[in-house]
């Protein structure tokens, strides 16, 4: 498998829209190289006769019947809020102007 260069890491970071500090490039280069070496090892495993799957353990969703439930009265819900303004909840500002 070919060696991963610092330029390869910069390119992957750019494609992933990651802003990597220059001092971390060498670290990530080594880590990416290790990951790709491991993938190379996985490629050598004989999977002849093994059925394709998307997960190692079969999972089944547990569902329930849909049912109609009463909707709480809007006024009761609004009255539980610490602050309200008319028919709306009043919440602290979280975005700058």
UniProtKB/Swiss-Prot annotation:
Keyword match DNA-binding: no
SUPFAM superfamilies: Glu-tRNAGln amidotransferase C subunit (SSF141000)
Pfam families: GatC
Alphabetized UniProt keyword annotations: ATP-binding, Ligase, Nucleotide-binding, Protein biosynthesis
Molecular-function GO terms, alphabetical: asparaginyl-tRNA synthase (glutamine-hydrolyzing) activity; ATP binding; glutaminyl-tRNA synthase (glutamine-hydrolyzing) activity
Gene3D superfamilies: Glu-tRNAGln amidotransferase C subunit, N-terminal domain
InterPro entries in the record: Asp/Glu-ADT_sf_sub_c (IPR036113), GatC (IPR003837)
Membrane-spanning intervals of the chain: none
EC number per UniProt: 6.3.5.-
BP GO annotations: glutaminyl-tRNAGln biosynthesis via transamidation; regulation of translational fidelity; translation
NCBIfam families on file: gatC (TIGR00135)
Family stated for the protein in its record: Belongs to the GatC family.
Subunit structure, interactors included: Heterotrimer of A, B and C subunits.
HAMAP family named among the record's database cross-references: GatC
Full protein name: Aspartyl/glutamyl-tRNA(Asn/Gln) amidotransferase subunit C
Organism taxonomic ancestry: Bacteria, Bacillati, Cyanobacteriota, Cyanophyceae, Synechococcales
């Amino acid at each position: 498998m070919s060696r991963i260069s610092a330029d390869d890491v910069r390119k992957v970071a750019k494609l992933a829209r990651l802003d990597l500090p220059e001092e971390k490039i060498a670290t990530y280069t080594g880590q990416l190289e290790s990951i790709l070496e491991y993938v190379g090892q996985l490629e050598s495993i004989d999977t002849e006769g093994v059925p394709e799957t998307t997960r190692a353990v079969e999972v089944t969703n547990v569902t329930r019947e849909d049912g109609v439930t009463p909707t709480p009265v809007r006024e009761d819900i609004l009255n539980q809020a610490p602050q309200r303004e008319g028919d709306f909840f009043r919440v602290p500002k979280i975005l700058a102007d």
